[in-house]
A protein has these predicted regions:
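Position-specific recognition of the canonical hydrophobic site in helix A of tetratricopeptide repeat
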Residues: 17, 44, 51, 78, ...
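Structural marker of alpha-solenoid helical repeat scaffolds
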Residues: 35, 69-70, 103-104, 137, ...
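Structural register within alpha-helical repeat arrays
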Residues: 12, 46, 80, 114, ...
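TPR/TPR-like (Sel1-like) alpha-helical repeat modules
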Residues: 165-176, 180-209
Length: 238
C-alpha cells in the first residue's frame, strides 16, 4: 500500500501524465532523486517519461538502476523492453521478454513483443510458435492473430494466413488491415471473387453463402453481394 507521504507525488505525476507534460515529469522526478536516489516512484516514472519523449537510452539507464535493486521488477523490465524495441535492438528485446516470461508466463504483451522481435531477426518459424503460445492463453488476442497471419503470409503459407485474417474479421470487423491483407492473399491465389468479398469485410462463412446464392441464381458474386447488402439495409430500415 502506498503511504500518505507517497500519494502526493503520485497524484501530481498522474496529472502531468494526463496533460502529457513529459518535460515537467522528468524535472519533477529528477528533483526527487536529488534527495532520494533510490526513490522507486521517481525512477519508474522517469523511465516511462523518457520513453514517451524518445530518449530511449536514458529510459534504459533508469530501468537498470531499478533492476540492480529489484531484478524482477515488472515495470522496469517492460519499460526496458519497450525502449529496446524503439531502438530496434531485437536481441535485447528477446532477452527482456524471456526474463519477464520466466516470472509472468501468461503475459500476452511480452509474448507478442517477443514474436515481433523474432520476426525482425528472421526467425519466423520461432515467431509463429510464440504467437501460437499467446493464442492458447488468449485465443481472441487481435495482436497475436494479426502478427501470425502476417508472418504466414510472408512465408507464403497463404491458406493458413487466411484463417487468421478471417478470425480477426469475425472478432473485430473494424480492423480494416485484416480485410486488406486477406484481399491480397486471395488475389495472390488467383481467386478474384474471394478477393472481392474479402475487401468488403466478408468472412469465409458469409462468402460461401454469397457464392452459393450466385451459383443457384446464375449471376455474378458481385451481384449476389449487392443484393444481400440491399436486403440487409432494407430490413434495417423497415
Amino acid at each position: 500500500m502506498v503511504g500518505l507521504i507517497e500519494q502526493e507525488p503520485l497524484l501530481h505525476l498522474k496529472k502531468l501524465f494526463e496533460k502529457k507534460q513529459f518535460d515537467k515529469i522528468i524535472s519533477f522526478c529528477n528533483d526527487i532523486l536529488k534527495n532520494d536516489s533510490k526513490n522507486m516512484i521517481a525512477l519508474q516514472n522517469l523511465s516511462t517519461a523518457y520513453i514517451m519523449v524518445g530518449a530511449n537510452d536514458d529510459a534504459i539507464k533508469y530501468c537498470e538502476i531499478v533492476l540492480k535493486m529489484y531484478s524482477s521488477d515488472e515495470h522496469a523490465l517492460k519499460n526496458k523492453m519497450f525502449a529496446y524495441e524503439k531502438l530496434e535492438k531485437h536481441e535485447e528485446v528477446i532477452s527482456c521478454c524471456d526474463i519477464i516470461l520466466t516470472k509472468y508466463p501468461d503475459d500476452i504483451d511480452s509474448l507478442v513483443t517477443k514474436g515481433i522481435a523474432l520476426n525482425k531477426t528472421g526467425m519466423h518459424d520461432d515467431a509463429i510458435e510464440i504467437y501460437k503460445t499467446a493464442l492458447k492463453k488468449d485465443p481472441n488476442n487481435i495482436d497475436a492473430l494479426m502478427n501470425i497471419a502476417v508472418t504466414l503470409k510472408f512465408l507464403k503459407r497463404l491458406d493458413d494466413a487466411i484463417k487468421y485474417y478471417d478470425k480477426i474479421q469475425i472478432l473485430d470487423p473494424s480492423v480494416k488491415r485484416a480485410s486488406i491483407e486477406k484481399y491480397e492473399v486471395f488475389t495472390e491465389l488467383g481467386s478474384s471473387d474471394d478477393a472481392f468479398l474479402a475487401a468488403q469485410g466478408i468472412t469465409i462463412g458469409e462468402a460461401k453463402e454469397i457464392k452459393m446464392q450466385a451459383k443457384e441464381n446464375d449471376y455474378s458474386v458481385q451481384h449476389a453481394y449487392s443484393l444481400r447488402r440491399f436486403y440487409k439495409l432494407q430490413k434495417t430500415n423497415s
